[in-house]
Amino acid sequence: MVSPIVLAALCGMILLALACVRRIPRGQVYTLRGRDGRIRTLGEGLHVVLPLLERVAHKIDLAGATVAVNDLRRGERDYRAVVYFQVVDPRQADVVIDDVEGLLRVTTRRLFDYAVLPDDTDARRRWLKQSLNDELRERGLLVARIDLAAAA
């Protein structure tokens, strides 16, 4: 006969072992933050995590997302933009991922107010995309496309 204490300890060890296993879905990356502050990234698949020493800081989707930027003004005209972006370096993006939409809106508005913005719509779109990528590349983000249109 097995002692209830041994049985409880065995059940506790099994539950702890199950809590250590994480399945990361395809197209996502988890960033883990240790108690010492170091960051570890986990790609798709099964991984072992130390639940008391590490916690999931962010679940980052690598598929891409969009951000609408309204109230862009150029001269007498109002514009609106849709910025299509994706995370290319989760370790660098971990720092800004909580407010990535705000970062993209503020940066797009600041660049749109730039004095030497091209007059042609396609050239303006290309310039804006290149300028956003120049600023956001070091933060692990890539702007894939920008839809820019005059506001109705």
Place the predicted regions along the sequence by residue.
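Membrane-helix interface and helix-disruption motif detector
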Residues: 1-2, 50
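Single-pass alpha-helical transmembrane signal-anchor segments
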Residues: 2-21
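Juxtamembrane/interfacial segments flanking transmembrane helices
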Residues: 21-32
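A generic structural motif
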Residues: 26, 36-37, 88-90
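Membrane-cytosol interface motif
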Residues: 30-51
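Amphipathic, interface-forming alpha-helical segments with heptad-repeat character
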Residues: 57-152
